[in-house]
Amino acid sequence: MIIAITEIMDLIPHRYPFLLVDRVLKIDPNKSITGIKNVTVNEPQFTGHFPTRPVMPGVLMVESMAQLAAILVAKSLDSTKNKEVFLMSIENTKFRRIVQPGDTMHIHSVIDQQRANVWKFSSKVMVECEIAAESKFTAMIKDKM
């Protein structure tokens, strides 16, 4: 099932310039999700990271993995209209390849464990069939205030 940007914006609260998932290519609710982020030179982080050689910041790659996992949570629960997903911890993060404008990040997240409102994920970012980043993280689902 492909999920376009308009539905993504219905599922998570992030907006430009911090919306870091462009499209979901495949989703298996309660299991895994794959999406993409097209990296373009006109994104604001590249004015300072780095002006003469733009490089996608690692923290934004981690954020893209977390956003994709939040979409998976939204599609796995019966209703997320009154729920929010919050990042609790990040573990074993590794950056293995530079990501730069013109690259397409293929992001994949898998649910490792779910207990009540705490979910654990393994995620990775691939560019041209190479691992660019990988991480494990934990998120908490809370009622909206």
UniProtKB/Swiss-Prot annotation:
**Does the record bear Lipid metabolism in its keywords?**
yes
Superkingdom: Bacteria
Q: Which Pfam families match?
A: FabA (PF07977)
Tell me the compartments it is located in.
Cytoplasm
**Which keywords accompany this UniProt record?**
Cytoplasm, Lipid A biosynthesis, Lipid biosynthesis, Lipid metabolism, Lyase
List all membrane-crossing ranges. Answer: none
Q: Which reaction does it catalyse?
A: a (3R)-hydroxyacyl-[ACP] = a (2E)-enoyl-[ACP] + H2O
**Which is a GO BP term held by this UniProt record?**
lipid A biosynthetic process
Task: State the active site.
Answer: H49
What GO cellular component is one of the record's annotations?
cytoplasm
EC numbers, comma separated: 4.2.1.59
Main location per the UniProt record: cytoplasm
Molecular functions (GO terms): (3R)-hydroxyacyl-[acyl-carrier-protein] dehydratase activity
Family statement drawn from the similarity comment of this UniProt entry = Belongs to the thioester dehydratase family. FabZ subfamily.
What does the function comment of this entry state? Involved in unsaturated fatty acids biosynthesis. Catalyzes the dehydration of short chain beta-hydroxyacyl-ACPs and long chain saturated and unsaturated beta-hydroxyacyl-ACPs.
| Protein name from the UniProt record | 3-hydroxyacyl-[acyl-carrier-protein] dehydratase FabZ
**Native species:** Rickettsia typhi (strain ATCC VR-144 / Wilmington)
Q: Which gene encodes it?
A: fabZ
